Amino acid sequence: MSEQKPSLTYRDAGVDIDAGNDLVNRIKSTAARTRRPEVLGGLGGFGAMVSIPAGYKEPVLVSGTDGVGTKLRLAMQLQKHDSIGIDLVAMCVNDLVVGGAEPLFFLDYYATGKLNVDVAAQVVEGIGQGCEQAGCALVGGETAEMPGMYEGDDYDLAGFCVGIVERDKIIDGSRAQPGDSLLALGSSGPHSNGYSLIRKIIEVSGADLSQSMGDTTLADALMAPTRIYVKNLLKLIREVDVRALSHITGGGLPENIPRVLPKGTIAALDTQSWELPPVFQWLQNAGGVAQEEMYRTFNCGIGMVICVPEDQKALAMDTLNAMGEKVWQIGVMEAAESSDAEPVVRYAPGLLTA
């Protein structure tokens, strides 16, 4: 008589469908808090349906996707998962508002080797908080348990967002011109970029992550969630002629500002107009990082750069200050020698005080 083969299940292969269902039930209330009137239906369908908001004449949809890089590894090391979801939303929605778009809805992708429902629920709760801060709806997502692809309950994240803007209100930077003022909005820390270098600095320096860093610890300074500028910038756009916006992410100031400027222009930045926040000073000193490398790796305390006409600079700064933003003038727009020259950043210490 032949020996009966064992009856294998999906759970035997490392995939727990019940855990996935448990997670969905736990996050339904989080998604419900973010709901917008345009959302049709709830979580659990094959596709989320969202109508175009009323009042638009020529609506343009704007989409974006991003992740949080190796900040995830630091989150796992510190067992701090409650704010990484805010980072995920911020990286997507801040990119959308650069074009003048209001974020409408957001979806996430959570991939792991073994689903830890408690950790995943913390992450999604953070995603919900981020969506509330940005005013967009969390309409769905994907939780992928993939044994053999990730070690243990290590996880990776990706976010996807769609926003909307009136065609004649699109901000594409094409109207930025010499003489315009460049304003900076303060960041909360490294946000979600440069963490491979940050982790290398921690490793090489043997840093104690519990050490004091200003009024917090080094760990908390490095894990501070990315600022979400959406609501304040949308208000600013209604009050001021915003000609360009640049979200300072990977590549820092010299890589991101030129992305939104027309040919034949230079963004002249007064590097004496602000002081590196303590966490960036620590990174530079502990890692022996050159100044140029700091500027092209980290945001160095600046999360967003705004280009406005010189005669609207005061109004823009007053408006942002009234909303609680830390804002200052960082530079001015200049003309390049050739109208065909690619836009660049020029460091000009003392420019604004000369």
Curated annotation (Swiss-Prot):
- Which BP terms from GO are recorded? 'de novo' IMP biosynthetic process; adenine biosynthetic process
One family from Pfam that matches here is AIRS_C
Keywords tagged on the record: ATP-binding, Cytoplasm, Ligase, Nucleotide-binding, Purine biosynthesis
Q: In which pathway does it act?
A: Purine metabolism; IMP biosynthesis via de novo pathway; 5-amino-1-(5-phospho-D-ribosyl)imidazole from N(2)-formyl-N(1)-(5-phospho-D-ribosyl)glycinamide: step 2/2
State the compartments where it is located: Cytoplasm
Nucleotide-binding among keywords: yes
- Record bears the keyword Ligase: yes
Q: What class of enzyme is it?
A: ligase
EC? Answer: 6.3.3.1
GO MF, one example: phosphoribosylamine-glycine ligase activity
Record's superkingdom?
Bacteria
Catalytic reactions on record: 2-formamido-N(1)-(5-O-phospho-beta-D-ribosyl)acetamidine + ATP = 5-amino-1-(5-phospho-beta-D-ribosyl)imidazole + ADP + phosphate + H(+)
Q: Which CDD domains match?
A: PurM
Entry GO terms, CC: cytosol
Provide the family line. Answer: Belongs to the AIR synthase family.
Q: What is this protein called?
A: Phosphoribosylformylglycinamidine cyclo-ligase
* Organism of this sequence: Marinobacter nauticus (strain ATCC 700491 / DSM 11845 / VT8) (Marinobacter aquaeolei)
